């Protein structure tokens, strides 16, 4: 079973996270930020990952450190759960329609950290959550797997719908990328023999 628990503690956030890549989409998330909780719950559900996460952050300042550090911790958890990435499919992508919004998420668990964030929301906030924190979350994630992650928005007017499509699409794309390829269970999916 590919399941890990990690802790990440800084002067800004204290995070405990348990991730099971072979789960059923169960979640228990408390980041101190309702919108981020909602997005992570959608991510876990649509990726079929079991996720238990608590974060105590300096939310009296804003949600920036919480979003960034949770992304870092989630990336670290994926890295630990995947190990040397033997037998995985490596690549995954998903077009996610959410009402009028349409977003592509494409992932390569390459060992190389890249985020392409081609998402354009028309508002700067959803409730009291700064929209720019979402790209910081995914940058922290990509750097710590490490992985190449692309988000490309094709349509969308409603900021909540656009960001929801991003998190659901990422869950679906990552579910495909981490899936074990039964025909190549013992192989590392790279001609180099190593994913770095």
Kindly label every feature range from the protein language model:
Residues 1-196:
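N-terminal intrinsically disordered, cationic/polar leader segments
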């Amino acid at each position: 079973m590919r399941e890990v628990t990690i802790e990440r503690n800084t002067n800004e956030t204290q995070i405990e996270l348990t991730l099971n890549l072979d789960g059923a989409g169960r979640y228990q998330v408390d980041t101190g930020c309702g919108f981020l909780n909602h997005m992570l719950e959608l991510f876990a559900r649509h990726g079929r990952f079991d996720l238990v996460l608590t974060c105590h952050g300096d939310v009296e300042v804003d949600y920036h450190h919480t979003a960034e550090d949770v992304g870092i911790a989630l990336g670290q958890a994926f890295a630990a759960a995947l190990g040397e990435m033997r037998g995985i499919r490596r690549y995954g992508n998903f077009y996610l329609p959410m009402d009028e919004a349409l977003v592509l998420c494409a992932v390569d668990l390459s060992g190389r950290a890249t985020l392409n964030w081609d998402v354009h929301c028309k508002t700067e906030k959803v409730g009291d959550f700064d929209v720019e924190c979402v790209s910081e979350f995914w940058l922290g994630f990509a750097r710590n797997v490490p992985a190449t992650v692309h988000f490309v928005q094709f349509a969308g007017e409603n900021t909540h719908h656009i960001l929801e499509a991003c998190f659901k699409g990422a869950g679906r794309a990552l579910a495909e990328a981490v899936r074990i390829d039964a025909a190549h269970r013992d192989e590392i999916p790279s001609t180099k023999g190593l994913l770095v």
